[in-house]
Amino acid sequence: MRLLLLVPFVVGCANKGNGGASATGSCQPQADNALRFDCDLPTDTDVIVTLEGPEGTLTRAGGPTLTLAGLRPGSTYAWSAAVDGAPIDSGSVTTGQLPELFDDLSFTVTGTDGPATIALPTMCNGQAVVTVVDATGSVVWYQPFDTTATDPTGGLSGFSITAAQTVLVHLDGSRIEEVAQSGATLFSVDGFESPLHHDLARGDDGRTYALFADLWDIDGQDVILDGVYVLDPDGDVVATWELVDHLGAVDVVDSGDKFWASTFPGAVDVSHANAIDPTPSGSAVMSLMLQDTVISVVLDPDDAAFGEVGWVLGPDGAPIVGDALTWLSGAFAGQHHAHVEADGDLWVFDNVGADGPAGERYAIDTDAGTAEQIASYPVDGACDHQGSVFVDDAGVLVTCPTPGRVDLFDADGAVTWSLGVTCGGGAGSGSLTFARAQPITF
């Protein structure tokens, strides 16, 4: 494993110049990004920067060297910096035009009162980029990434926003990177023994949790089963969890899913994990799509119970050894983005459930051994791959990538705002792929 801590270095590709960005005063445009400005302010303490622009008043906080980000393209902002309310500097910045990759990648909005800013990881015509858009659909931040693999495991295959509002990704199934809003690379690790896939997340403990896959033999058949790498803040793998250690009797049935066809030819994918979410308790929830099952696992390496499966939520006969929960209502199938919110409720994007695709909320009672659906946010049309559901200040944000759509639901379950995502006019699998849209703040 290798850890790189490269604060001034900005990663990227297909990002030629800064689109004509300009500035006055102590802030200067980044050479290779149209929407970011690096400031070196005349103070040695923390500052508040106020910007006046087309969307009104914005504020940014940081040390004397900070980056202004989250700005619309082709726009001028007057800025002023203050320490404890006393002005120390002022100037203006004018953002440039977006790079060529946005000639194909575009966003359209219907409705009003959308989320302030959301981040989307996209592969558009082979270009990996994380883009942040505001409630009007305007791009306000972007970060391209270099990728080379062309099979389903390649490109930008895992994504999450950390509690520190940084961007965490894994690329080409082989490396993990964390990028600050300034564009600086904070974390870069490669050299994994097994291929990464689908999802990764940063826990409150500062550790990074990443899904991987391994090849196993079950009764003479090559079988693909999932695991989790646990990395410490230095990028070292400090623990590994393997699903194979927690399986009962399993029927090896070829689902026809070809995600791993080029990596593990001839093998049968049994579990197909697609979500990992560490919780403050030291456990994590994991979605196993091909088992229509979500499980809770102790993944804190400092816990004597590390590796133990707690509850198991899925159909009768699910082969994972753990405490099976009883459905009081609801059920899901082919699910994605299983995670636990602060109130302890489980949220899942249900791709092919009985009531069609929907973001769903479940109350989990481990004492009673039950799961009860308490909310559902259905989307129109098919969602046969990926998908997510997030709780945002503006409402419940549900992503259905197949048609390239993100919907915002209000407290009454009505869609009040939608974002359409297209790549050269196309959506869904093919020219455009993206897994989720996640709230982010600047």
Task: Locate predicted features.
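Ser/Thr-rich, Pro/Gly/Ala-heavy low-complexity intrinsically disordered linkers and tails
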Residues: 1-24
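Extracellular low-complexity, O-glycosylation-prone stalks/linkers
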Residues: 46-58
